[in-house]
Every structure is written in C-alpha cells, then in structure tokens.
C-alpha cells in the first residue's frame, strides 16, 4: 500500500483500498498458503500471496493437497503495462559498530555467490539477487512476461508506512 501511495497518491490509493476491501470474499484469515487454498476451493476469485508460496506448494513439500490446490491457481502481476509489480525485498546489512565486521562482509559476499543464490532460489523459491542465476522453474511468472517495479524507491515504503496504515484502517482492512 505504501508503494501505491508513493506512485498514485494517498487519495487515489484510499479509493482503491475501499474498493479492494469491499470486494473481499471473506474476512482475511490465515497465511499466504491459506489464501491460495481458498481460491482453489472456490471461496474467492483472487487473493494476495507471495509467489514463493505458490512454488513451495507446487513442489509438493507441503503435501499433495496443497500441491493440487496450487495447480488450480494462476498468478496475476499488476501494473505490467505501467511501472511493473511491487516485489518484496530481502537484504543483508552490517551494523556500524559490529564486532566482527570482516566476518559480516564475508557472509554477505558469500550470500551473493552463484552457489548460495542457487541454494536460496531452490529452497525458498525466492527470486535470485544476482545475474546468472535463474529462478526455480516452479516460481510463477518465470514463464510469463513479468515486469518488476524498478521505479519506486524502497525508501518510499518506510516514508509512506504511516499513511499506508491509515489508508488501510479507514478502508476497513483487517
């Protein structure tokens, strides 16, 4: 929602949020996989879920029922004709006064190696952080023309967080 505010303004995002909430098939409950299961069961036509959960379910690691459910859903990526879809980010950092700076740098450097990234994408189903490593083929969107939002500054998410919470509360988002 903070990303939407950064791109569309608070008022337009508030209108969108009211429409979004009014179209919810049920009160929000459960995690991402619960949303995917609800769609597969016909309880809703759409839900918001991270793609790595669909891939996890497709992998069979969460059982045959979840694998079958994931096969019934189709991902949709918004804003593909515009700025691209919002993506959650993962990051690594080091505290200014970290007692083991050299080891912290080594860890971050290791996490950005091809070996580590391949392990990450094949076990968490997240998108890779470096060129030369492909997403796991189970990740939805790999075979689609997917456009990531590279326009919106991550800094804006924090700057718009309070506004996002206010917009969601006013819309009745629980």
Question: Where on the chain are the PLM-derived regions?
Answer:
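Extracellular/periplasmic bilobal clamshell ligand-binding domains
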Residues: 135-174
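Mature extracytoplasmic/periplasmic domains
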Residues: 90-149
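Ligand-binding pocket segment of bilobal, Venus flytrap-like solute-binding proteins
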Residues: 2-78
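Soluble non-cytosolic domains of exported or imported proteins
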Residues: 11, 30-33, 48, 97-102, ...
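Structured segments of extracytoplasmic/periplasmic soluble domains
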Residues: 7, 23, 38, 42, ...
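Flexible, solvent-exposed loop/hinge segments that line or gate ligand/substrate-binding clefts
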Residues: 68-99
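Solvent-exposed, polar/charged alpha-helical surfaces in well-ordered, non-transmembrane soluble domains
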Residues: 18, 37, 41, 102-109, ...
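Solvent-exposed loop/turn segments at secondary-structure junctions
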Residues: 52-55, 80-83, 99, 114-117
């Amino acid at each position: 929602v903070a990303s939407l505010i950064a791109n569309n303004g608070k008022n337009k995002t508030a209108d969108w949020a009211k429409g979004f909430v009014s179209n919810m098939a049920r009160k929000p409950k459960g995690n991402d996989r619960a949303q995917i299961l609800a769609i597969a069961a016909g309880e809703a036509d759409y839900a918001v879920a991270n793609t790595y959960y669909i891939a996890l379910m497709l992998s069979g690691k969460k059982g045959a029922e979840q694998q079958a459910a994931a096969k019934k859903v189709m991902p949709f990526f918004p804003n593909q004709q515009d700025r691209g879809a919002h993506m959650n980010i993962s990051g690594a950092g080091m505290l200014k006064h970290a007692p083991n700076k050299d080891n912290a740098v080594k860890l971050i450097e290791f996490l950005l190696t091809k070996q580590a990234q391949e392990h990450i994408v094949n076990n968490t189903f997240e998108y890779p952080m470096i060129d030369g490593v492909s997403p796991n083929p189970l990740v939805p969107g790999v075979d689609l023309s997917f456009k990531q939002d590279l326009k919106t500054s991550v800094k804006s998410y924090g700057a718009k967080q309070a506004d996002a919470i206010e917009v969601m509360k006013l819309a009745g988002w629980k």
